């Protein structure tokens, strides 16, 4: 899927987007169609993309990184694992398998903000944080430990290749 990661420099989690919202919408709608449809309507998916771009700019997190990770974690928003669509948990935060659904947020906006703010914490220890939106503590040793997408492996998830897998989703989004 996408461009081989080994041939590319690392991808920063923080910064300006390399893509437009229209490119991201193509990625989201194509991905969900290929998977047999999403748990949400196309309108909700478009609203989700808009929220990632708006909140990503506020949080200084690249929206395509958040959307790529969300596509991986939710199975292109089919929510066939432990996390349900009604939780607005876009990255499986707190879901550790065995039926444990993880964190829930009250709205799409808060779910996107919680996801992107958590990514920001992994990428930078110096940024100010509203810890209430995070709803789950993050060990201090992880704050700023993953400035690049590839560095998420073994931290966000146990797999050492997790970050490389997320990068492949982001590459697919960028090339959509």
What are these regions (language model features)?
Residues 1-176:
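Catalytic cores of secreted/periplasmic lytic hydrolases that degrade extracellular macromolecules
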């Amino acid at each position: 899927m996408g461009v081989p990661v080994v041939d590319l420099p690392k991808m920063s989690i923080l910064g300006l987007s390399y893509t437009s919202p229209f490119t991201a919408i193509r990625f989201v709608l194509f991905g969900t169609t290929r998977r047999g449809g999403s748990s949400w309507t196309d309108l909700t998916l478009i609203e989700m993309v808009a929220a990632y771009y708006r909140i990503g700019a506020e949080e200084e997190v690249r929206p395509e990184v958040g959307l790529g990770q969300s596509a991986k974690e939710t199975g292109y928003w089919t929510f066939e694992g432990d996390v349900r669509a009604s939780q607005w948990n876009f990255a499986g935060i707190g879901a550790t398998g065995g039926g444990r659904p993880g964190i829930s947020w009250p709205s799409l906006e808060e779910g996107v903000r919680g996801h992107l703010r958590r990514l920001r914490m992994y990428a930078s220890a110096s940024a100010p944080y509203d810890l209430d939106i995070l709803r789950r503590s993050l060990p201090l040793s992880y704050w700023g430990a993953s400035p690049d997408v590839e560095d998420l492996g073994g931290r966000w998830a146990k797999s050492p290749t997790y970050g490389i897998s997320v990068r492949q989703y982001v590459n697919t989004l960028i090339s959509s």
